[in-house]
Amino acid sequence: MRQVLNTPYWYNKEERIPKKLCEEIIEICKEYEMDEAGVFGANEKDKLMNTSYRQTNIAWIPKGTVVEKLLHSHVGLANMQAAWNFTVTDMEAAQFAEYTKGHFYDWHKDVALNPATPHRKLSISVNLSDPKDYEGGDL
């Protein structure tokens, strides 16, 4: 198998988003309609439910919002600093996930080739809660 990247497969930004900003992002995202998460598909029609694999509630963050722009800027920064230098032409709508007691998202790889999302090259995870307040979330 030919190696595509000579750089790391992940990028971890040690600098944290300030706690106050995290709290504001949570408040903004809780205003969006929350729904039970599926494991694949960009819309309700394509959503597959598999509660042995993923159990959480999510909201879609609309494009053009302050939160989406903040995430997009972090993706661009990681793309440059990790020296991936992908040409990012578009981003899927980001998800805000709320994990309550008993909720989880098991280990997985985003490897499905989906003709509807040929631009999908990078993923971002931002933990907004204090790590002392939950178990898991490791990448």
Name these PLM-found stretches.
Residues 1-139:
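Fe(II)/2-oxoglutarate oxygenase catalytic core
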